[in-house]
Curated annotation (Swiss-Prot):
Pfam family, one: IspD
Keyword Transferase: yes
Keyword Nucleotide-binding: no
GO molecular function: 2-C-methyl-D-erythritol 4-phosphate cytidylyltransferase activity
CDD domains membership: CDP-ME_synthetase
Name of the protein: 2-C-methyl-D-erythritol 4-phosphate cytidylyltransferase
Biological or metabolic pathway of the protein: Isoprenoid biosynthesis; isopentenyl diphosphate biosynthesis via DXP pathway; isopentenyl diphosphate from 1-deoxy-D-xylulose 5-phosphate: step 2/6
Domain of life: Bacteria
Record field: catalytic activity: 2-C-methyl-D-erythritol 4-phosphate + CTP + H(+) = 4-CDP-2-C-methyl-D-erythritol + diphosphate
Chain's role: Catalyzes the formation of 4-diphosphocytidyl-2-C-methyl-D-erythritol from CTP and 2-C-methyl-D-erythritol 4-phosphate (MEP).
Source taxonomy: Bacteria, Bacillati, Bacillota, Clostridia, Eubacteriales
Family, as annotated: Belongs to the IspD/TarI cytidylyltransferase family. IspD subfamily.
Keywords assigned: Isoprene biosynthesis, Nucleotidyltransferase, Transferase
Length: 229
């Protein structure tokens, strides 16, 4: 039977947090951010396995968190690579061979909802690839090289992409392997498919599905958690 697998990418160093501790290990309400993220997927009935990708020297720390909080479904903890795309590729190679849909998610997004996860799987089964996100609340400007505003896109045409980003496993693996062969750089996994002419369906995420990357995000995260509990 085919599986739905999730790759949690926890290999970032969190330089923007101005902390010696990687952002995924910082705490909200006395529990590490990574705990909340892992829990969302481990308790979701449609998720069959979790592959956690982290810094090589943090593998033991991640194992301790998993054991301490009795988080299940984590099949492997694997070391990350030099860039995020390398870490994702390591995760792709580690998922079960019978994986059909793979979700790729930032460890520092602890407030992903059950509906976002479920819809990602559903739309991927329908379209082959799907990513959640939100329409920007602010007006967006395009500026010239000299710093002047030259255009104002319609907000309805813009989309702030979040994670999970969800894919047919064979499609995303094939595109990642081509990416390595051609030595191309990308900033997220939807770009991996876009590089090879593949379409990604964009569906509604949630404004609370934030990525915690700055001290201000940590404060906002505490407020979001207060509302959820």
């Amino acid at each position: 039977m085919s599986k739905n697998s999730v790759i949690i990418v926890a290999a970032g160093k969190g330089k923007r947090m101005n902390s010696s501790i990687s952002k995924q290990f910082l705490q909200i309400k006395n529990k590490p951010i990574l705990y909340y993220t892992l829990s969302k997927f481990s308790t979701h009935e449609s998720i069959d396995e979790i592959v956690l990708v982290t810094l090589e020297d943090k593998i033991e720390v991640c194992g301790d968190i998993i054991d301490k909080y009795n988080i299940n479904k984590v099949s492997k903890i694997v070391p990350g690579g030099k860039e995020r795309q390398d870490s994702v590729y390591n995760g792709l190679k580690a998922v079960s061979k019978d994986c059909e849909v793979v979700l790729i998610h930032d460890a520092a997004r602890p407030f992903v909802t059950s509906d976002i996860i479920e819809n990602g799987i559903r739309y991927t089964n329908q379209y082959g690839a799907a990513a959640c996100g939100v329409i920007p609340k602010d007006t967006i400007k395009i500026k010239s090289e000299k710093g002047f505003a030259i255009d104002t896109p319609n907000r309805e045409d813009l989309f702030i992409v979040q994670t999970p980003q969800c894919f047919n496993y064979n499609i995303i693996l094939d595109c990642h392997e081509k990416l390595k062969k051609h030595n191309k750089k990308v900033t997220d996994d939807t770009m991996v498919l876009e590089n090879y002419g593949k379409s990604v369906y964009l569906y509604e995420g949630n404004y609370s599905n934030i990525k915690i990357t700055t001290p201000e995000d940590l404060i906002l995260g505490e407020q979001i958690l207060e509302k959820l509990t």
